[in-house]
Structures are given as structure tokens and as C-alpha cells.
Amino acid sequence: MHEHNGFNLVYLTETDPRGSMGLAGKTVGGSGSWPGALRAIDVKTAKPAWRHEWPGVNGGGGSGGILATAGKLLFTGDASGNFVAFDATNGNPLWHSRIGGLTNAPETFAIDGRQYVLVAVGDTLYAFALGQ
């Protein structure tokens, strides 16, 4: 974990106690609900800071990895094929784009002072410019 400039939250995805959905480890049948949430925990108090319940089929859930930026934004995918930006301070969704199922973590880079978020879906690479 890394704490930077007083902003000290750790982001974890909630897991289902029944195991994985057949990708590895224990296999669970295809019926029922798969609850999911994106949570932030204050590392100084070890108490939950906020929680975002994933909407969608069978409880939704996140997909791919999570990117946290110095600008207090989080980027990840949901089970409905959306690429979602969250406010890292309160967990509120700020923006989304339906680009398909994410299986990889997004990346960030800057060109000439402008920050971009890059994410791959299948054989397509998407780049989104962040506001200035």
C-alpha cells in the first residue's frame, strides 16, 4: 500500500465466499446471485470509507483491474460492459462508456501535460482524455 499527500484510501473489490465462477479454483453453478461491490477503506482507521454496489445481471460485479489516479479518480469496468470513472473520495460514479467486457486493468499516461486513460477490450484499444 502507498499513502500519498494525505489521501489514504485502499481500494478493494469484494469477493464472493462461494469461490470463482469457474475460471479457477472452486466452480460454482451458473444460477443465483453474484453480489459485488467496490469498497474503499481508510487505512488510518481500518474502517470503510464508502461502498459502491454493482448493478446488473446477477448482482453485477467489477471486471478487469482498478486504476487509481493522483487526481482522485478510479477507473474500472462493470459486468455490463461499461468502463466507469468514480470519484475516489466518495465512490460516486462520474462517467461511463459502454465499450464491452474489460478483462485487463486500465493504464494512464500523459502527452504534453494532458492525461489519458487507456484500456483494451478484445482487439480494440480505447484512449480517453481526462478533462483539464
Locate the predicted segments by residue.
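Blade-level signature of beta-propeller repeat domains, shared across WD40, Kelch, NHL, RCC1
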Residues: 104-132
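Surface-exposed loop/turn positions within WD40 beta-propeller blades
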Residues: 35, 71, 80, 122-123
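Beta-propeller blade signature
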Residues: 34-44
